[in-house]
Regions:
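Short, strongly patterned local motifs
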Residues: 40-47
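Local sequence-structure signature of Cys/Sec-based thiol-disulfide redox active-site neighborhoods
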Residues: 106-159
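GST-like fold's C-terminal all-alpha helical module
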Residues: 192-195, 203-204, 208-336
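Intrinsic disorder/low-complexity segments enriched in small, polar and charged residues
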Residues: 3-7, 13-15, 19, 24-30, ...
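Short, flexible loop/turn elements at secondary-structure junctions
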Residues: 123-129, 152-155, 184, 201-205, ...
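Structural micro-motif
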Residues: 161-201
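N-terminal regions that are enriched for targeting/export leaders
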Residues: 62-117
Length: 336
């Protein structure tokens, strides 16, 4: 399919961008997804992440973290979920750890300056927050401007954060670090939280500069615009920015974080609340897509990427560890 100029991003997003998203299967560890979807997910076209389901023995021994809930079924949660006790509030609801490094890019005092070959995205394949900037980086053609380094769990993940086990000598090839947390400590010696992904690292200073996954893709879209090729799609157009920001602010608690609210919570009350909220929000999302090919009309935007990385995992991964599934994504005709 021939790609048109930036003035007509619909063709780019329908062809070049879709092919680029398909190539992300290699990056995100995904397998081929059925191609019969005709709705929004079918248009975005990508894969779905697979993760381990607890064995029957683990369930019998209570190692899946299950508890009774009014919806029936079982929450087949992973063992590591139980380790996030610092993120559980008094009534058992999951409250996500605040981002530690939120210094923005921009011209204001203290703002980070966009530079080529200065920053690297440190990410994990199974983390949907990580997949966002990696997908956007490639859609915008920033592969030669911002590096990317994958991290992975290790035996010391709880103490030191993710490691670089897939690289020679178990070291980050760009900085020589052994653990992601080293960048956090170098930026703030008093940091005591969890080193999370994605993290934007200043590879020259070897320190974390931003782990604000809420805004990281926007910085790539706007502040790194001078480094993008002329035919790169505009994922954050000025005329829609206010609406995109408002939509993303709704999307995060209700859809993106909805899975984690169900999976990580420690009380049936918190689970039921998250369950109802998630499916009510899916209904709203499906309704929105009745008249739109994508979330903001004919063009893929930042919001589509954010919704995609969550919903594409649901039917083949997330539902395994959140309990009963009220309705699979494939039954939402406009989303699917």
């Amino acid at each position: 399919m021939r790609t048109k100029a930036r003035t007509d991003p619909a063709e780019q997003n329908g062809g070049k961008a879709r092919r680029s998203l398909t190539e992300k299967r290699r990056k995100t560890g995904t397998h081929d997804f059925p191609k019969d979807g005709q709705g929004w997910l079918g248009a975005v076209q990508a894969g779905a992440d697979e993760r381990r389901i607890p064995t029957e023995g683990e369930k019998e021994n209570g190692e899946d973290g299950d508890f009774p809930n009014k919806h029936g079924g079982s929450r087949a949660m992973y063992a590591e979920i139980q380790k996030h006790t610092e993120d559980i509030e008094e009534r058992g609801a999951f409250i996500r750890q605040p981002n530690a490094f939120i210094q923005p890019f921009g011209d204001k005092e203290g703002g980070l300056k966009a530079e080529a070959n200065r920053f690297g995205i440190y990410w994990a394949t199974g983390c949907n927050w990580s997949n966002r900037p990696i997908i956007v980086r490639e859609l915008l053609g920033l592969q030669d401007v911002i590096s990317e380094t994958r991290v992975s769990p290790s035996g010391e993940t709880n103490r030191y954060g993710h490691a670089f086990g897939q690289y020679p000598d178990f070291k980050d090839p760009a900085t020589g670090a052994y653990f992601l947390s080293e960048f956090y400590k170098r930026a703030n010696p008093d940091f005591k939280g969890r080193a999370t992904t994605p993290t934007l690292v200043d590879v020259k200073e070897k320190k974390a500069v931003n782990n604000d996954y809420h805004r990281l893709t926007n910085y790539l879209e706007v502040q790194f615009r001078p480094f993008q090729p002329k035919d790169a799609p505009d994922l954050y157009p000025k005329k829609f920015r206010k609406e995109i920001d408002e939509f993303n602010d709704w999307l995060f608690p209700h859809i993106n974080n909805g899975h984690y609210r169900m999976a990580f919570c420690q009380s049936p009350e918190a689970y039921d609340e998250a369950y109802e909220d998630f499916y009510e929000s899916l209904d709203k999302l499906d309704k929105r897509l009745e008249t739109n090919r994508f979330l903001f009309g004919d063009y893929i935007t930042d919001s589509d990427v954010r919704a995609y990385v969550t919903l594409i995992r649901w039917d083949v991964s997330y539902f395994h560890n959140v309990g009963p599934v009220k309705k699979p994504i494939r039954d939402y005709k406009n989303i699917w």
